Every structure is written in structure tokens, then in C-alpha cells.
Amino acid sequence: MNYVKIIEKNKNFIELELVNDDHSLSNLVKEILLAKDGVILASYGVEHPVLDPDTGRYISNPTIMLKTDEKTDAETVLKEALKDIVDLCNKTLEDL
């Protein structure tokens, strides 16, 4: 089961762990965050993945790190980025 674990959170920094995931969502979130004003750092890291015998997918627990400038609230920017991803998915569904 996939879920998100908050590792660290303050006004200008958030680190999340995406448990049992791969590069897909982490990379997308990072790219959307990098386009946002006030973002100083948006990155993700993945330790060596393992093969999930149930799904045949290589999974790991990627961590996403977001750092913002002093004027920008990290949680707000992360929520905006996640909303942008949902909007992109909805637009794609409409266009199909």
C-alpha cells in the first residue's frame, strides 16, 4: 500500500517519503515545484529499489525535499503543485 509520510516540516522546508513508490510521482512533483515562484530547492532521492514480487514493479521509498525562500510557505507551494497535477490529469481526461 502506498502512502505519504512527513519526515520534516516547517515554514520554509518540507521533506516527504513516498512509501512503496517509484520515480514517477516524485519526478513529476519535483518538476512542477521547480516552476513555482519562491522555490529555492525541489529535489527527490531514491535509494536502491527492490522488485515487488506482487506487482513486478521496482519500488523504493523516494523522498521529496522542498525548500522555499523566507517569503514563501512551503506547504502552500506543495499544495499548489499537487493541485496543478490533479488539474493536468483532469484536463487530459477531458481531452480524451
Swiss-Prot record:
Q: Which reaction does it catalyse?
A: RNA(n) + a ribonucleoside 5'-triphosphate = RNA(n+1) + diphosphate
Q: Which GO terms describe its molecular function?
A: DNA binding; DNA-directed RNA polymerase activity; protein dimerization activity
Q: Quote the SUPFAM superfamilies the UniProt record gives.
A: RBP11-like subunits of RNA polymerase
Q: Which PROSITE patterns match?
A: RNA_POL_L_13KD
Q: What class of enzyme is it?
A: transferase
- Which terms under GO biological process does the entry name? DNA-templated transcription
Q: Which InterPro entries match?
A: RBP11-like (IPR036603), RBP11-like_dimer (IPR009025), RNA_pol_Rpb11_13-16kDa_CS (IPR008193), Rpo11-like (IPR022905)
GO CC, sorted alphabetically, is: cytoplasm; DNA-directed RNA polymerase complex
Quote the EC number: 2.7.7.6
**What are the protein's UniProt keywords?**
Cytoplasm, DNA-directed RNA polymerase, Nucleotidyltransferase, Transcription, Transferase
Q: Does the keyword Transcription apply?
A: yes
Where is this gene product found?
Cytoplasm
Per the database entry, which stretches of residues form a coiled coil?
A: none
> Known HAMAP family for this protein?
RNApol_arch_Rpo11 (MF_00261)
Assembly and binders: Part of the RNA polymerase complex.
- Role played: DNA-dependent RNA polymerase (RNAP) catalyzes the transcription of DNA into RNA using the four ribonucleoside triphosphates as substrates.
Protein family according to the UniProt entry? Belongs to the archaeal Rpo11/eukaryotic RPB11/RPC19 RNA polymerase subunit family.
Q: What is this protein called?
A: DNA-directed RNA polymerase subunit Rpo11
Annotated organism of origin = Methanococcus maripaludis (strain DSM 14266 / JCM 13030 / NBRC 101832 / S2 / LL)
Its lineage reads: Archaea, Methanobacteriati, Methanobacteriota, Methanomada group, Methanococci
